Amino acid sequence: MTIDRTYPIFTVRWLTVHGLAVPTVSFLGSISAMQFIQR
């Protein structure tokens, strides 16, 4: 029963972390790529 209760919380946390981390990583990567291309 405890597993069923904690599982949704972990999935929500996973989705939020990835939802925030993926865009930031891609944004930083694009910025660094643009800087490298300009130079």
UniProtKB/Swiss-Prot annotation:
SS bonds (residue pairs): none
Membrane topology category: Single-pass membrane protein
UniProt xrefs under InterPro entries: PSII_cyt_b559_bsu (IPR006241), PSII_cyt_b559_CS (IPR006216), PSII_cyt_b559_N (IPR013081)
Keywords carried by this UniProt record: Chloroplast, Electron transport, Heme, Iron, Membrane, Metal-binding, Photosynthesis, Photosystem II, Plastid, Thylakoid, Transmembrane, Transmembrane helix, Transport
GO terms under biological process: photosynthetic electron transport chain
Transmembrane segments annotated in the record for this chain: 14-30
Residues annotated for heme binding in this entry: 18
Location(s) in or outside the cell: Plastid, Chloroplast thylakoid membrane
Major location category of this protein: plastid
An annotated Gene Ontology molecular function: electron transfer activity
Free-text remark on how the cofactor is bound: With its partner (PsbE) binds heme. PSII binds additional chlorophylls, carotenoids and specific lipids.
Cofactor(s) this protein requires: heme b
Highest rank taxon of the organism: Eukaryota
Entry GO CC: chloroplast thylakoid membrane; photosystem II reaction center
Subunit structure: Heterodimer of an alpha subunit and a beta subunit. PSII is composed of 1 copy each of membrane proteins PsbA, PsbB, PsbC, PsbD, PsbE, PsbF, PsbH, PsbI, PsbJ, PsbK, PsbL, PsbM, PsbT, PsbX, PsbY, PsbZ, Psb30/Ycf12, at least 3 peripheral proteins of the oxygen-evolving complex and a large number of cofactors. It forms dimeric complexes.
Family, similarity comment: Belongs to the PsbE/PsbF family.
Function according to Swiss-Prot or TrEMBL: This b-type cytochrome is tightly associated with the reaction center of photosystem II (PSII). PSII is a light-driven water:plastoquinone oxidoreductase that uses light energy to abstract electrons from H(2)O, generating O(2) and a proton gradient subsequently used for ATP formation. It consists of a core antenna complex that captures photons, and an electron transfer chain that converts photonic excitation into a charge separation.
Protein name: Cytochrome b559 subunit beta
Organism: Lactuca sativa
Lineage, highest ranks first: Eukaryota, Viridiplantae, Streptophyta, Embryophyta, Tracheophyta
